[in-house]
Amino acid sequence: MGKTLYEKVYDAHVAVAAEGETPILYIDRHLVHEVTSPQAFDGLREKGRKVRQVSKTFATMDHNVSTTTKDINASGEMARIQMETLSKNCEEFGVTLYDLNHKYQGIVHVMGPELGITLPGMTIVCGDSHTATHGAFGSLAFGIGTSEVEHVLATQTLKQARAKTMKIEVKGKVAPGITAKDIVLAIIGKTTAAGGTGYVVEFCGEAITDLSMEGRMTVCNMAIELGAKAGLIAPDETTFEYIKGRKFSPQGADFDAAVEYWKTLKTDADAEFDAVVTLNAADIKPQVTWGTNPGQVIAVDQPIPAPESFTDPIEKASAEKALAYMGLEAGKSLSDYQVNKVFVGSCTNSRIEDMRAAAVVAKGRKVASHVQALIVPGSEQVKAQAEAEGLDVIFKEAGFEWRLPGCSMCLAMNNDRLGPHERCASTSNRNFEGRQGRDGRTHLVSPAMAAAAAIAGHFVDIRELTFDKQD
């Protein structure tokens, strides 16, 4: 029987497989940030160990950096300590660090791919839930805890049980204006936020292969939000074109040889998955979450669901609780509610394509007077590219705030956060209670939908907006 893409990558990395024991996998790349690494480095220090392979370990500062200044003190005492500690640890152990003032600084899951650190067929780990992002390249990438961070630093390996496999196929082409974010939110709406638990997911189908690498990263980024361990997309010409010429990518003949291997990284025709989920791309509309997990999502033109519409008693109770927390009334439209803040950014949607999509909506328009709207590029490289294209000017003229790179309002670990009961249209990946600030209300949307909400002051259907034909 043939193998799935996941099985091929997993099997190629088994370093030790003893009977009755969880296999030990070799790890090709280890990405590190300031929040989940301090205790791991302390553990190495206590035991007198070194970082086993510094050339495969890359660090940056992202979670609690300020997006208004490069001052390390700006996000408070804990943030300053974490960033200073990362700096000291990387210097002591010889690890490459892209710190606050480095031209490659950025969100770890934006920085890795754009520098060619992320390559097809690799195993990639990071002390961060959304490491699955890198699976867009056909790599096996997943988040790990701090004790596992220490283990990988010390050994370049990790115990990892084989997961079940799930195929999620999005058949056909999406309608105009439908983005990768809409696709993945529609997927989670179908599977629920726990539907992928215990699985590694492979996303496929015409709607997936039509996506750019930025779009594919958005989809894989949210694999964790349907409960999956990781999400992968088979590499193809789009992947190879993106990788070519990047800082850490193979060059010349080495690149050609790598591509020959990467072309083998696809699921065999006779491979079997443990579960299969299918969606028709043509049915996908612009998506907005209404509740407090990413599976509580509807199309923008659908009414807010009533708890009674759920047959499962747990889902019904969850819906009741979510509506109360979110301050929403069943049967109403999401467009009936004003938004207070808009956030375009995060490891889900802060790449150049996302900036461009938001700028198309912003051009020649103005942010509503009651809305604060933040545009936060995912890295210094994205910021520089956007500014070279004049996108920052478009945003600033429209009344958006053009910020410095960082995780920003995705999570309440820096100064960008919601106040109690503030409603936010956000391009991030989690709408949990308190995720963006205590009692904050988060609605997950695409960059274009977020920008449109900033201008209208409430949610609108992006398909009903008209754009300058010159764009």
From Swiss-Prot:
One of its GO terms (biological process) is L-leucine biosynthetic process. It catalyses: (2R,3S)-3-isopropylmalate = (2S)-2-isopropylmalate. Its EC number is 4.2.1.33. It comes from the Bacteria. [4Fe-4S] cluster binds at C347, C407, C410. Binds 1 [4Fe-4S] cluster per subunit. PROSITE patterns: ACONITASE_1, ACONITASE_2. Pathway: Amino-acid biosynthesis; L-leucine biosynthesis; L-leucine from 3-methyl-2-oxobutanoate: step 2/4. InterPro entries: 3-IsopropMal_deHydase_lsu (IPR004430), Acnase/IPM_dHydase_lsu_aba_1/3 (IPR015931), Acoase/IPM_deHydtase_lsu_aba (IPR001030), Aconitase_4Fe-4S_BS (IPR018136), Aconitase_4Fe-4S_dom (IPR036008), IPM_dehydratase_rel_enz (IPR050067), IPMI_cat (IPR033941). Its cofactor is [4Fe-4S] cluster. GO terms for molecular function: 3-isopropylmalate dehydratase activity; 4 iron, 4 sulfur cluster binding; metal ion binding. Catalyzes the isomerization between 2-isopropylmalate and 3-isopropylmalate, via the formation of 2-isopropylmaleate. Belongs to the aconitase/IPM isomerase family. LeuC type 1 subfamily. Heterodimer of LeuC and LeuD. This is 3-isopropylmalate dehydratase large subunit. It comes from Vibrio parahaemolyticus serotype O3:K6 (strain RIMD 2210633). The gene is leuC.
